Amino acid sequence: MQAPRELAVGIDLGTTYSCVGVFQQGRVEILANDQGNRTTPSYVAFTDTERLVGDAAKSQAALNPHNTVFDAKRLIGRKFADTTVQSDMKHWPFQVVSEGGKPKVRVCYRGEDKTFYPEEISSMVLSKMKETAEAYLGQPVKHAVITVPTYFSNSQRQATKDAGAIAGLKVLPIINEATAAAIAYGLDRRGAGKRNVLIFDLGGGTFDVSVLSIDAGVFEVKATAGDTHLGGEDFDNRLVNHFMEEFRRKHGKDLSGNKRALRRLRTACERAKRTPSSSTQATLEIDSLFEGVDFYKSITRARFEELCSDLFRSTLEPVEKALRDAKLDKAQIHDFVLGGGLHSHPQGAEVAAGLLQRQGAEQEHQP
């Protein structure tokens, strides 16, 4: 009997969510995890009895905030003294300490204080992606391509490779997320001649713009721009603050100091934000949110877009900068790809399309 052919998987190790795909029968299949979701939260939690990764880790974050680690991608390959690390630390409920100048997260695991490097946390997420792929393929997975942001430094790229090795993966290349997106859409196979592509990727924690040229299957990144602290989380924060104020106005209670209530509200806001773009409004229903008070509230899509209008506008300058740096005019873009969660928001799509003024550019959406 012939041994199964070894397959390499592709892993998008994201700041807030990760996913794994495999190329079969001429197309990329993004695989569902054990919860039936094609994206898995990049969360790792430690309890008195076990370690949780993904959906299970995120779902208990409200009850266990100090030992639930996320945003490891913001730490990986960086020094503890980096200004971005020092700034981010102020917003995390878990503790970050320095060891030899490198950041480590400190948690309580099985009753003991433990510290982990960001690569170790990321390796736990990568292991979850590996398990997801193995469950689907029915065979061991040893090889993986892992994507990183174009702006990642050599040390960040190497640390990501190290995370893959810790997870038991032989990392083939580390490739830029923008290049991976262009390949996924088959833009390298779209007719003869050189094509210019703009990737507009609003992820959970970062916003990245890349301009690529594709010629005879060869990809060249012409320019990159973006904001490493603009992403879906910022849109979530607007919703959380809006509903916190609504709760205070309606019930005269301030829940801003209650971490569990805030985490439950944030989870409900994330769910509301993912309401299909065909819907005109989303509803929050949270039983006993704070001091026994139930909270039921709706928000229209128009109101959401009004709350976030400045965030949508702030995506414009990075696009213009990327085009300037690539020495290209809007009219010279043949294709543009809307990635991350942006494609579900009509205003987000309108911002990108309006800025490029289409000019016959073909628009693609993330699956």
From Swiss-Prot:
Name the domain of life this protein comes from. Answer: Eukaryota
Q: What is this protein called?
A: Putative heat shock 70 kDa protein 7
Keyword annotations for this protein, in alphabetical order, are: ATP-binding, Nucleotide-binding, Stress response
GO terms, molecular function: ATP binding; ATP hydrolysis activity; ATP-dependent protein folding chaperone; heat shock protein binding; protein folding chaperone
Q: Which organism is it from?
A: Homo sapiens (Human)
Question: Is Nucleotide-binding given among the entry's keywords?
Answer: yes
Q: Which GO terms describe its cellular component?
A: blood microparticle; cytoplasm; cytosol; extracellular exosome; nucleus; plasma membrane
PROSITE patterns in the record? HSP70_1, HSP70_2
- Coiled coil, from the record: none
Key word Nucleotide-binding present in the record? yes
Q: Which GO terms describe its biological process?
A: chaperone cofactor-dependent protein refolding; protein refolding
The record's similarity note reads: Belongs to the heat shock protein 70 family.
